[in-house]
């Protein structure tokens, strides 16, 4: 998840949000486990879970969930082989749609701070009862069960079995820093691409207008 700052900003305004997360994927699919899409109070959409029919169906599910509806765990089978199949990527994805409330603001502030410092942190979402997911954020590795730590070490998000409960584990993944020497048009395009895939971008240029964050 790289939406912690966006989520925190909206929660600070007292908003209720809908968050869609790919929690499991097998085979070929447009996005990986951990990809997310956020729907805000004014129905703005931040992030993507891959577009197409899947995203359209999930977006439709987000609207009632944001207003107070029951969380949903949606299953999409994209292994259709016929030419008229709507979804033929070849894979299968499970997507959790949950309501995010202002009471959860401390978790998201903490996660955003950890990400900015490249510090350890991991999201856990107990989805044993998909209608009532339990989301929490953890920063103390020594307090986590061995199966969770094993998943964290894989540097990827996934669902695991934890003492008979189904738990989604999403470690903070720090992509590193891209330093651009010069702020011209090539660096601008490179920086935008690097930011899009999760890197922190630093531009070094003695011309203030070229090193401006507004670019």
Predicted ranges, named:
Residues 1-215:
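Segments forming oxygen-rich coordination pockets for charged ligands
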